[in-house]
Amino acid sequence: MVGHSESSTDAVIEPTSEELLAEQVRVFNKMKGSTNFNRVAEDVYPVEVTKSKLVCEMVVQHQHLNSKGTLHGGQTATLTDVITARAVGVTVKDKGMASVELAVSYLLPVKVGDVLEITAHVLKVGRTMAFTDCEFRRKSDGKMSAKGKHTLAFLPNQPGISVENGTQF
């Protein structure tokens, strides 16, 4: 039939970017005061979300530093892990995930007080794995301070993230 369109009951309603952002803010807020290792992301704040990208910001504080007074490499690696997994979790909600590969290249030092913009991209989501990358940029000059890569496997019979309790990272 000419001019026929699907009924509104058949259409899939996609969440808006504002709804996706609100969900990620709730997830990251659950990390505040966490007693597990996710606590290293408690100062991260999501600022932009799409189905293939998550942008967060973090002000570097003393607890994020190494003995040389710059952002600790382990902090950067953990943020790569957590933020890229959350980027995948924007669309993959029903599966648990585990890291298969995580790599970070450290390009420039970041000091206390610097604001980092952390952008995670979902490159591909397959049946059993997801591939991501992550860029850390100093907001003051836009220079890239670190570049990460993270490959995740989907775990059979494991729950996805629960926004209510912030579990499953």
UniProtKB/Swiss-Prot annotation:
Record EC number: 3.1.2.-
Superkingdom field: Eukaryota
Enzyme type, top EC level: hydrolase
InterPro entries: ACOT13 (IPR039298), HotDog_dom_sf (IPR029069), PAAI_dom (IPR003736), Thioestr_dom (IPR006683)
Record bears the keyword Hydrolase: yes
Pfam assignment, any one: 4HBT
Keywords linked to the UniProt accession: Hydrolase
Any one GO molecular function term: fatty acyl-CoA hydrolase activity
Family according to the record: Belongs to the thioesterase paaI family.
Name by which UniProt lists this protein: Putative esterase F42H10.6
Naturally occurring in which organism (per UniProt): Caenorhabditis elegans
